[in-house]
């Protein structure tokens, strides 16, 4: 499966990553260096809707603590049938929405484009902090080598 980097369109020097490769780790903005590292590469399966951590494919993006307004995005052990772990990005670019909470999209919290800032699900508002580009690692690597 092809790995992807989920790049912020608010600041293209940043991407989505995790603080560690363990279940329960927070999803945050990270500095995009080269093709990303083990904590910032993702497998994206449009057939299932799972976005799994390339370094540990048993972990996927999930929503924790959803209160009707927002929820923290973490990586959690993949659980079949858990719709908070399913995402829709096909035909929705540049937004990535949650299947269980379809009005909610990945959002860079408080519009703060700084490394370490948390990623939440938040109601769609069209802001730059909700726009992402999914870059295939092989294509990104070729682009960097050609530069």
Question: Predicted segment positions?
Answer:
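Lectin-like carbohydrate-binding module/patch detector with strong preference for beta-trefoil
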Residues: 1-147
């Amino acid at each position: 499966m092809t790995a992807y980097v989920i790049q912020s369109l608010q600041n293209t020097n940043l991407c989505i990553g995790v603080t560690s490769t363990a279940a329960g780790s927070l999803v945050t903005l990270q500095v995009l260096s080269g093709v990303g590292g083990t904590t910032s590469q993702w497998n994206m399966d449009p057939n299932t809707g799972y976005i799994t951590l390339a370094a540990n494919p048993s972990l996927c993006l999930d929503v924790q603590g959803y209160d009707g307004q927002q929820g923290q995005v973490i990586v959690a052990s993949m659980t079949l049938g858990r719709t908070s772990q399913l995402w829709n990005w096909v035909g929705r670019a540049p937004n990535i929405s949650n299947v269980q909470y379809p009005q909610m999209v990945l959002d860079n919290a408080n519009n703060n484009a700084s490394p370490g800032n948390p990623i939440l699900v938040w109601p769609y508002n069209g802001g730059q902090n909700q726009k992402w580009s999914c870059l295939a690692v092989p294509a990104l690597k070729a682009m960097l080598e050609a530069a």
